[in-house]
Curated annotation (Swiss-Prot):
Pfam families: TrkH
Protein's UniProt keywords contain Lipid metabolism: no
Listed transmembrane segments: 17-39, 44-61, 81-103, 144-166, 186-208, 239-256, 268-286, 319-341, 385-407, 444-466
Protein name in the entry: Uncharacterized cation transporter MJ1485
GO biological process terms, semicolon-separated: potassium ion transmembrane transport
Membrane topology: Multi-pass membrane protein
Keywords: Cell membrane, Ion transport, Membrane, Transmembrane, Transmembrane helix, Transport
Cellular component aspect of the GO annotation: plasma membrane
Signal sequence, start to end: none
GO molecular function, one term: potassium ion transmembrane transporter activity
Length: 474
């Protein structure tokens, strides 16, 4: 049986997964109803009707199907479809509540939130209903921990299924011996940090509303603000608190688990992040004569894919913008809420290049052995790192070409294309409400494939392609 072949049982298994995901997203859609009622807004039905419909529809679909012999490529197909479905459902309340939004605009906004990219088409968010602002923040918060991670707790009747759902969303590491244990630990860490973030920001002088939304967008490294300014607070304490949240986002959940359990850790990704952050922050501060705290905040925001800024990025020099593009492309650590290629893959590529150089200059009799921390660098690991890096660069390049074809400045197009693909959210203003539909769709696709690290989307396309070929031959 070919990897791209889908039998009726395979399709039923995928539909079972999607049914559970649709049910969960439907339930999530009901949550903003509480905010709508509390603030006496007229958006209540805009959340209630789609929320109830998809909760029931997903429940029925899940009950009508059963998971049978699911493989990793099946859950990858389900994962790729899940993020699309989440955005299509999440867009409905936005479309119904924002008068000037087309449905494509709403899908763009929802995809940006779910994937924690943080791009927005809304020119004045401060006039939006509170329930809509909460929905944008809530989608980012859920998207940060992962739709499939949450769904695995509901859907998984076995550790195997849970692990397949977990890995299909571009995750590999285990914190606990079992997949279910790992997922539960991740969720509890995420909730704990969210509560701490809200509490600390509230004690710093923010209202509970601002503290809640800022924490949800900060801890998820989403960065979609409830203010017209990316980060409207000049207070040093608040900048530091959000900065700590963003730094937390660049560290993997396994590192957080070791921190919380008092175990020693010496993670190479964390070392890299701290060194590169300090180095590039100093360069930008000196080159563009901006305060070091603002430079540091912007660099951390770019690396963690949060997207908050305290300065106008468009005013930075070409060197600084290039360094930010580099940070956005590489992203944070594996097993984090951040986007990008991931630090560990970049380090693997550097080690592989070092190996090639050593092989040339060392004597033929020399035995060369490369490793990264406790990980031996074999062919499979190196190949995967190069493939993902190439696909990210290719996706960013193709997205930039579309923007350039629409008449946008090449430098701005490349910057925003990398920001889309790496789910960053820092923008030079390429995609706005006035952008042609094709430009918005390009942004949607770039955010989608970037969140899944591209491979599951390619598996989906390959599956659909070969399925279509077989149907045409009949």
């Amino acid at each position: 049986m070919g990897i791209c072949r889908l039998t009726k049982k395979d399709i039923e298994g995928i539909l079972h997964i999607l049914g559970g995901i649709i049910q969960i997203i439907g339930i999530f859609t009901l949550v903003p109803c509480i905010v709508s009622v509390y603030y006496n807004e007229n958006t209540f039905l805009n959340f209630l009707i789609p929320g109830l419909f998809f909760s029931i529809f997903g429940f029925v679909l899940k009950r009508a199907t059963k998971p049978k012999n699911l493989k990793l490529h099946h859950t990858m197909v389900a994962s790729a479809l899940a993020w699309l479905i989440a955005s299509f459902i999440g867009a409905i309340p936005l479309y119904l509540s924002i008068d000037y939004f087309s449905y494509v605009d709403a899908v763009y906004e929802s995809m940006s939130a779910w994937t924690t990219t943080g791009m927005t088409l809304i020119p004045n968010v401060e006039v939006l209903p509170k329930s809509i602002l909460f929905w944008r923040s809530f989608q980012q918060w859920i998207g940060g921990v992962g739709i499939l991670v949450l769904s695995a707790l509901v859907l998984a009747r076995s550790g195997t299924v849970a692990y397949l759902l977990y890995t299909s969303e571009a995750r590999q590491e285990r914190i606990m011996p079992s997949a279910i244990g790992t997922i539960k630990t991740i969720i509890w860490i995420y909730i704990l940090y969210t509560i701490l973030g809200v509490l600390l920001l509230y004690l710093s002088g923010l209202s509970f509303w601002d503290a809640l939304n800022l924490t949800m967008t900060g801890i998820s490294t989403g960065g979609m603000s409830i203010s017209n300014y990316s980060f409207p607070y000049n207070d040093f304490a608040k900048i530091v608190m959000i900065g700590i949240m963003m730094v937390g986002g660049v560290m993997s959940f396994s590192i957080h688990h070791k921190l919380l359990t008092g175990k020693y850790f010496n993670d190479i990704q964390t070392k890299y992040a701290l060194i590169v952050t300090a180095f590039i922050s100093i360069i930008i501060s000196i080159k563009d004569k901006v305060p070091i705290i603002d430079s540091l905040f912007t660099v951390v925001s770019a690396m963690t894919s949060t997207g908050f800024t305290t300065i106008n990025v468009g005013n930075l020099s070409s060197l600084s913008l290039f360094l930010i593009i580099f940070l956005m492309l590489i992203g944070g650590g594996a097993g984090t809420t951040t986007g990008g290629v991931k630090i560990i893959r970049f380090l693997v590529i550097l080690k592989a290049l070092l190996y090639e150089i050593k092989e040339i200059i060392y004597p033929k009799s020399a035995v060369i052995h490369e490793h990264l921390d406790d990980m031996d660098l074999n062919y499979r690991i190196i190949r995967e790192a190069f493939v993902v890096f190439f696909l990210y660069c290719l996706s960013s390049f193709l997205t930039a070409l579309i923007f350039i074809a629409l008449g946008y400045n090449p430098y701005d197009s490349i910057f925003d294309a990398v920001s889309f693909t790496s789910n960053i959210g820092i923008s030079l203003g390429v995609v706005t409400l006035k952008t042609p539909v094709i430009g918005k769709i390009a942004g949607i696709i770039a955010m989608w494939i970037g969140r899944l690290e591209i491979i599951p989307v390619l598996v989906l396309f390959a599956t659909l392609y070969f399925k279509t070929l077989r149907l045409l031959k009949k």
